[in-house]
Amino acid sequence: MALSSRLWRLLPLLRGAEQSVCQLARSWGSGGRCGTWGFRGSEVTGNTRAFKRGLLFSALSYLGFETYQVISQAAVVHATAKVEEILEQADYLYESGETEKLYQLLTQYKESEDVELLWRLARASRDIAQLCKTSEEEKKVLLYEALEYAKRALEKKGSSFAAHKWYAICISDVGDYEGIKVKIANAYVIKEHFEKAIELNPKDATSIHLMGIWCYTFAEMPWYQRRIAEVLFANPPSSTYEEALKYFHRAEEVDPNFYSKNLLLLGKTYLKLNNKKLAAFWLVKAKSYPAHTEEDKQIQTEAAQLLTGL
């Protein structure tokens, strides 16, 4: 519609220009000289035809450009609409716990440069890797695949909190295959990206929770790993249970009961701090959490075991 209206506006201008040139040709067609340029009638008539051809060529060029613009804009709108549709399907499958169907859907678009698709691909690959039926060899391949997707997402859009979050998660996962030195060195990178994710989106409870896990992990680091870290690094990463507790509570404040593992870790952290009353409070909540996933079931079992030992 926009292209048609532009063409309609252009045609009168072309007709007007053609008539003006023809009038000039007739007025100069007597063979006399006119003005300082001294055109002869035949020259003007010839130039008229050339000018008309030029106008036609210009019009076609203009229309070609306009057509290109309209088609390009339509393609962008269509592509955007398609991505939005895929994301809606992906989020529905994720919320429904359809891990394998989600992975099958998203891997069709693994060559995409869309950051929203890429970080979801990282998450989906990691979720498949965590399934009980996934072999150790397949798990390793999937975790490195997830890291590559997360890396591409981050390179595509450094302001995406989700890209920072999943890049940090995936680096942590592959650390199990790269030795203690690399794993400890990566801890700095992981912390940096979790902190950036929180900065970009302070309302994302998952990023805050993961920062809590980072603190908890280094608070309970075995003495031999701590010793290795001290030998390898001048300032090895470290944290405390109090700091971990702060992040777990903050995550709960942002989004109450968002994740069974956050409830479990609140209970476990209070146990580490010898506060059995508050530990029991959070462990009961973890045990009672509705089991939507395999992880939820495992957390229910662990919470029940810890409560038995109190």
Curated annotation (Swiss-Prot):
List the GO cellular component terms. cytoplasm; mitochondrion; mitotic spindle pole; spindle microtubule
Localization: Cytoplasm; Cytoplasm, Cytoskeleton, Spindle; Cytoplasm, Cytoskeleton, Spindle pole
User: What keywords tag this UniProt record?
Assistant: Cytoplasm, Cytoskeleton, Microtubule, Repeat, TPR repeat
Q: Which InterPro entries match?
A: RMD1-3_a_helical_rpt (IPR049039), TPR-like_helical_dom_sf (IPR011990)
What would be one Pfam family of this protein?
RMD1-3
Q: Name one GO molecular function term.
A: microtubule binding
Where, in residue numbers, are the TPR repeats?
168-204, 222-258
N6-succinyllysine found at? K165
| Principal place of residence | cytoplasm
Under the subunit heading, UniProt states:
Interacts with microtubules.
The UniProt entry's sequence similarity note says: Belongs to the RMDN family.
What protein am I looking at?
Regulator of microtubule dynamics protein 1
Record organism: Rattus norvegicus (Rat)
Q: Which gene encodes it?
A: Rmdn1
